[in-house]
Every structure is written in C-alpha cells, then in structure tokens.
A protein has these predicted regions:
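GST-like domain detector, emphasizing the conserved glutathione-binding G-site
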Residues: 1-53, 67, 137
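Generic structural signal for secondary-structure transition and capping sites
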Residues: 8, 27-31, 64, 68-75, ...
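Structural helix-adjacent loops and short alpha-helical linkers that scaffold large soluble proteins
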Residues: 9-12, 54, 99-106
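Charged catalytic carboxylate motif
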Residues: 18, 58-62, 87, 107
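Short amphipathic alpha-helical/adjacent loop interface patches that line ligand
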Residues: 23, 59, 63, 112
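GST superfamily/GST-like fold recognition
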Residues: 29, 33-38, 76-104, 109-115, ...
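Amphipathic alpha-helical packing segments from all-alpha helical-bundle domains
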Residues: 52-70
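C-terminal helix/juxtamembrane-tail motif
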Residues: 129-137
Length: 137
C-alpha cells in the first residue's frame, strides 16, 4: 500500500476503497486459509483428516468467490490490474497443490492466465529459482 501510494502505480485513488477491500480479503482469508490448505494437504497429508477436509472446503469456496467476482470484473478491484491482484495471484499459482481444478473456474482461470503472462510476474516467479516456471492450467 505504501509503495503503491508513493509511486502512484497499481493503487489508484479512484478505486482505492475496492482495492483495499480485496487486499483485506487476501490478508484475512485467501492467504491464511489457502496457506492452511497447503500445510495440511500438500506438506502433511494424512496427519489430520479434519484439517485436510476443512481447508480443502474453504479453499474450494474461495475459488468460487474469486470466480464470481471475476465474472463481473476484469481484475479483482475493477478494470485495472492493481496491488490486490499482485497480493492474491501467488496463492493461485500453487493451484496444482490444491487439487480443486482451476480450469473448472472460467473467470478465475482467465484472470490467472492473463496475470501469469505479465513480464514482471514471470520475472518475479523465477527470481529465487531460475528453473521455476509458472504452472499453466
């Protein structure tokens, strides 16, 4: 938010309220809940049936909510790519770990693929591991 505000990029004044709403959704729901799904389903499968089931269902609900939003909006906060998309996209970049089927969510898939082709996203994705490639559908 600070850098967006100072740079005047990806955090425009006109859409700031909606951008903030989606940032808070990412920080309060998308990140923590999908992170828990990663913990139980990907990193520690079989250790807690309750945890695996709970966070699978929550992650599936998040997919549906994001898909519904992206049905009426090109990006999360409106017609333009913003810091809300930047904060949320990395969680979807691990969609193969979720076993939900990103391709079953047309609007979320469109958004994911469009962002995955951005030069800065490609560069950032492989920053720590030059061999990393962004998963497709």
């Amino acid at each position: 938010m600070y850098l967006g505000d100072k740079s005047g990029k990806l955090y425009n004044e006109k859409d700031r309220l909606v951008i903030n709403q989606w940032l808070m959704a990412q920080m309060g729901t998308v990140g923590p809940m999908i992170g828990q799904h990663h913990q139980f389903h990907h990193y520690n499968p079989g250790k807690s049936e309750f945890g695996e089931e709970r966070y699978f269902k929550i992650t599936k609900r998040i997919y549906g909510e994001l898909d519904a939003r992206l049905k009426i909006s090109k990006f999360l906060a409106g017609p333009d790519y913003t810091i809300a998309d930047i904060a949320t996209w990395p969680w979807m970049a691990r969609h193969e770990w979720h076993d939900i089927g990103l391709k079953n969510y047309n609007n979320l898939s469109r958004w994911y693929l469009e962002i995955s082709e951005r030069e800065a996203v490609v560069k950032g994705y492989s920053f720590m591991d030059k061999e990393s490639i962004i998963p497709k559908l």
